[in-house]
Structures are given as structure tokens and as C-alpha cells.
Amino acid sequence: MPKEHKKRGRRDEQKKRKRDADDDATAKRHKKDDVDAQFQPLDAAHQLHHGGVGEDGELTRPGEVQFYGMLDEDEQEFFKNVDDQLDRNEFASPDERAQWLKNVFKEAEGKELKIANSQSCSRVLERLILLSTPGQLKNIFEKFNGHFLNLVQHRFASHCCEALFLQAAPVVTQELANPERLQTPPSSNPDHIFVSMENLFLFTLAELQEHLGFLMTDRFASHVLRVLLVVLSGSPLERQSKSVLQSKRKEKVDVTGAEKGREWLAEKRAVPQSFLEALEKVINNCVSGMEPHYLRSLATHPLGNPTLQLLLKLELSHFGKSRAKDEKSLIHRLLPDDPIAEGTDSAAFINGLVYDPIGSRLLETIIENAPGKLFKAIYGEFFKERMGSLSRNEIAGYVAGKILERLGKDDLEEAMRQIVDQIPSLVERNRTAIIKTLIERCVARGVDTASIKAQLETAYGGSNGFEVIRILKLSEEDGKPGGEHKQQSPEKLHGSLLAQTMMSVEGPLGNLVFDSLANLSPELSVQLARDPPASRTLQAALTSPNASVIFRRKMIQQFYGKVGELALDPSASRVIDAIWNGTAGLAFIRERIAEELAENEGSLRESYVGRAVWRNWRMDLYKRKRNDWVKQSRYTAGNDGFQSFPESDGDASNSQTRAGKHMTAIELARQKHAAAKAAAQGKKDMKKEKTERHGTGSNSSAVGTKGRVVAQ
């Protein structure tokens, strides 16, 4: 296994600063004893890589990493001050910051490589890249040109390369959409040659091309290579799995002012045809020189596996699933047998991945992206009769989840029958992710969930029937006031997600959770609100379209007298925010909550989360102009008059449409009673008016006169 990826920068005070040359040497080592013991074929795989074998048959690795020198003390102090100024963000205007940034880059002129390799200053360069203009990004590209092979393998410089590729990606799309951007701008340097961002990326790829096989399993370069592949493909950068693009331990580097205009991260980008051609060439070169045996060894390599996943996904999504028939394709090299049957190399490969902590992730990618014909063959041969046993396993359960996402209705019903029998065992082992996926797919395919409901009701049953606190794993220590919010266990998070998924299903399955929540004591309800995972379940319950008015009324009333206290808690404050939407059709409850918030104004204003609740509930308007607050809150609820209990003063049907999908029997009875009472009152008023209009005796003239006056 590779060494632990420590956080970098001056914040890691426990480590002494080392020379960059030592870091470079460390970056090239992979705990050779551990890795080679498990993945012996890798060196041979690298030797077989195109361009990776010399004439004498020895492995051609990248040369010695170049040492670019170190910043002197004054330079380090300067960039430390730059980092502090970025944190303070005390610029009067964006123009002032742009001018300051220009001066910083002027000071850094000629020192870019030293900064990128510096333990204390590389983070500063990474933050500066996030604020850079396209011209400044191109300048950094040009300074790094010819040195990328060294930089991507460096512990600190590799982060700068990642940031540079990500920030430069939209510039390629902008230049493609607006060719006038490619016109050579006036330059003070007559020898300056204008280069498009497209060509800068292609130059970088050409520099790395010869050593791609080695970089795929390099501790730091593998992450940069994946980012570069995603940029070339035009795929959304934020939708990629974090484990595929970067290490889980990677420090999140950000800077104020870089948040705006980053919507492109979640969007598919238009890229030039040269990028797609380069991507196809990379995929071909990465596998063309490797025998299938050596290529498969990457599937269980901790660094090679994510790169292999990405290459496989990009191949099938960008070049058509018909590519699987091409003998030179990556998917065909991994699974060459047709048909795939027991006893073949492909079968041995698949069976070896199912229970492997690393290899199973590649199998998930194959299942998710394989052509329909190939998926059906794999499912029928290896998994159709094993869904129950797969779901019980901690690792294979995730493979089973991916399989469920691709099954049709008939196959899903058969798989459900196998998994439902295992639900008691799954609940006992806290492996609820597969149950959540099964419910979601049953809803999507229109499969009846009655058997799932029965098993869950039994598995989480107690003295009072189904107990939601068992599914949420709530202990006596959780949610206590003044307690610290510790990192939550995966079991609690998965339990909360399962409860939320159940509530998204209309009918008996969702009602299990709703009824259990409504029957909790006020103390337990407050405890749930304070517990982070359980709090999200409460939020979902209060805002669910399947939650009835009666449930929301009962649930919210559990918090009476505790609203001010809960609004100060980081988790419970979000429940108070959710009550705003949860009181649609419940005017008196919304105003009751607002009154409690107003009573605790002082403490709320002194707390960060309290101020957020105060703002979300528009309490400033409530304090100044309460009538306006009432009108606006009624308008946002979509009902001119909120539904009160037990009678309705407004449009009950509209309230019910927004608050819940269906009215219960008692709600229908109340609506009918209110309508009958209103009709009776109307008849009574009409009779009285008729009597007054046709008055008798000495009062007839007076009554008639009064009627005429009113009519006027």
C-alpha cells in the first residue's frame, strides 16, 4: 500500500522541513515491499508498455527528478504575506485585487518552479491559480512547459498542476466558442508567441505520453493524470467520484473570490476534436503494450485501479459501447472471452474482483457502463442466483447495488425475493445500503414493496411496533445539550439514509417511519433533532410530500417550549428551518414557533446558527410589521388562509395539495363537517336577511328603509 498522504504546508508543524530533493525521492517510492508483494506483475507490465522498454530490455523510467532550487528567506516571507492577504481579503474592489494579483505574479516571475516545489509556498501558488485570468494561466503553463514530467511526480507541485488543469479547462471551451479570443493580443514583448490553451494542453500531454504506464501507478502523478483525462474528455469535473480524481486525504484549498463563476464544474464542456483524438490515443497507448494478464493486475492496484476505472468509463461513454467489440479496446482486453463462461480467463477475473476491496470498484464500473448485451451475459452467468449472498457481504454488497440499478422489472422482482430473505441478517450487520438501493429501484420500476415493509417492520420492531430510533442508532449520549458533535459512524449515516428513502415511498412503507416519529416523546424528539444524522431524517419528514397534515402537526408540537434552545444547535437549527415548510396549512403553529423565536431574540442574535434561523424565518419583519409577516408567510405557503384544526378557514384542497398528497379519513370528515357547517350558516343568514327585508307591523317601514340605505 502507498504511504499515508500527509497534509502539506506550514500547518503540518510536527514535521521538520526537508529539502525538496528528498521529497522528490520519497514521491517516487511506493513502499516497495508491500506493493510488490501483492502486485508482482506490475514491473513487467511497465516494461511491456509502449516506449517503456529500452533496447537492452530494461525499464525506461522517467529520469532523475530535477531540483529547481529553494526560495530564500525574504522570498518565503513575501509569499507568506501573500497567503495572509488572501485570507484577509481586504481589497476595496475586484479591480484592486486584480492589480494586486498582477503585482504578485510580477514578483514571482522566474520563480514559479521553485514556488511549486516549495513545501511552504506551493499552497500559495495553488490559491493564486484559482484567481488567475486566462492570460496568467497561460503564463504559468508556459513556465511549467518542459517540466511537467517532474512536477506531476512531486508531492507539492502535483497539486499546483491539478489546480492549473482544472482552472484552464473552461478557457479551452471559451476559445472554442469565441475564435476572436485566439487573435494575438498586443504584447510589450515583440518576441512573444501567442499559443492557444488547446495547444498548451496538447503540449503537456505530449510531454507525458511516453511515460503514461509508469505515471498510472505513481503516488502523486496518477491523480494529475486522471484530472488531465477528464479535462480532455469534456466531462463534468464535479460529478466525477472524488476517489477517482483525488485522494480522500487531499486538503481542500480555496480562496475567497474564486467561488463565483464555477458553475462550469458541474456542466459538460465542449472540447475540440483534437482533445478527443488525444484521449483515444492515450487509451490505446495505455493498454496496447500490455498483455491482458498484466493489465488485469492493475485492477487490484490501489493507484492503478482508479485510473483504469476512468479509462474504461471514458472509452465506453465517449467512443460508443459498440467499441466493446473491438479487440484492441480496453474492455475487450479485460474480458476477451465470448461467451463469458465458467472456466475462462474472463470468469476468473470477474470472480476475483467481486470480494476484493479495490478490484470490486472496477467491477462496479464495468457493470455500470458495459453494453446491455455484455451486462446481461455477466449477470446471467455470475450473479443472477447469488444476489442474496452478495448482498450480505460488506464488499460485494456494493456490486449488488450497481447490478440492481440496471435490472428490468422481472429480474428486479426475482432479485428482490432473494434479498428480502436476507433483510434480518442485513439489519443485524448494519448493511442497510443495499436495502436503500433496493427500495429506490422498486419504486422506479413499479415493483410492490409490501414484502420489504414486512421484513423491516419485524427487523426494527420493539415493544411499540416499528421503532425509528433503532434504525437511527440513537444512544443515550447522542443529542445531549452542550455535547460535542463527534464524527458519526457509517452505520448511523446509512440508517438515516434508509429512513429517508422509506419516507419517499407513498403508502405503508413510508408510514412506518411517519407513525413512529409521531409517537415519540418530546424528549426523544428533541434528542433526534440534536443528533446530526437523525436531524436530517426529521428534516426530510417535515418537508416530505407524503407527510400528512396530522403528522406534521403532531411532530412540530413536540418542540413547543424548546424552539429557542434548538435554534442554537448546529443540527437542530436545520430542523427549525424545515418547520417553515412543514407548517404549510398550519397558520397557528407557524405563528406559535415565530413567537418562541421572538422571545429568544437576544440569544439567537449572539449565535451564528441562531442568526441564520432568525434570517430564514424573516423575524426582523415579524418584529417590525407583524401583519406584513403574516401576509407574506401565507403567500409563501400557497394558501390565503391557512388550514387550522379542527376546521378549515381557507382553501383546504389547495393546502392539502401542497402539504401532502392525500387526506386521511378524519381529515376528509373534518372538511365535510366544515363545509356542512358553512352551508348551514349561509342558509341561516339568508333566512334572517329575508325576514328583515319583509318586516311586519310598525317595523316594516324602518326595515325597508335600512335595506335601501345599505343597498346604496
From Swiss-Prot:
The keyword Transcription does not apply. GO terms for cellular component: 90S preribosome; nucleolus; preribosome, small subunit precursor. InterPro entries: ARM-like, ARM-type_fold, NOP9, Pumilio_RNA-bd_rpt. Residues 1-40, 640-712 are annotated as: Disordered. Disulfide bonds: none annotated. Pumilio repeats lie at residues 107-142, 143-178, 207-246, 345-380, 381-421, 519-557, 558-595. GO terms for biological process: endonucleolytic cleavage in 5'-ETS of tricistronic rRNA transcript (SSU-rRNA, 5.8S rRNA, LSU-rRNA); endonucleolytic cleavage in ITS1 to separate SSU-rRNA from 5.8S rRNA and LSU-rRNA from tricistronic rRNA transcript (SSU-rRNA, 5.8S rRNA, LSU-rRNA); endonucleolytic cleavage to generate mature 5'-end of SSU-rRNA from (SSU-rRNA, 5.8S rRNA, LSU-rRNA); ribosomal small subunit export from nucleus. RNA-binding nucleolar protein required for pre-rRNA processing. Involved in production of 18S rRNA and assembly of small ribosomal subunit. This is Nucleolar protein 9. Residues 640-658 have a biased composition (Polar residues). Residues 10-35, 682-695 have a biased composition (Basic and acidic residues). Gene3D superfamilies: Leucine-rich Repeat Variant (1.25.10.10). It comes from Leptosphaeria maculans (strain JN3 / isolate v23.1.3 / race Av1-4-5-6-7-8) (Blackleg fungus). Pfam families: PUF_NOP9. It comes from the Eukaryota. Belongs to the NOP9 family. Keywords: Nucleus, Repeat, Ribosome biogenesis, rRNA processing. One of its GO terms (molecular function) is RNA binding. It is found in: Nucleus, Nucleolus. The gene is NOP9.
